[in-house]
Amino acid sequence: MTSSALKNEPKAMNVRVHDGKLIVDLVDGRSLTVPLDWYPRLAHATPEQQRNWVLLGDGYAIHWPDLDEDIGIEGLLAGNRSGESRESFERWLSGRKK
């Protein structure tokens, strides 16, 4: 991959949840908005957990440590929803209720 290609790769700089949507601001000035329901762990999280995120790899991905959730920016741009199976999500959700 050339250095010019790396400069054009999308990177996040800010993340927020508002009105049932995940909003990711990119360093190039774009903002991505997707339904929060695309990511069930985020949809079922408390507002505090939703705000507790860190950028990985200089902004190429977002990690929510309280939720064990990772979202890559390229996947978000491609319209990829959570790839977690229903069974895995149900196990995670039942573990939170204990």
Whereabouts are the PLM-identified features?
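Motif-centric detector for short Cys/His coordination patterns
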Residues: 1-98
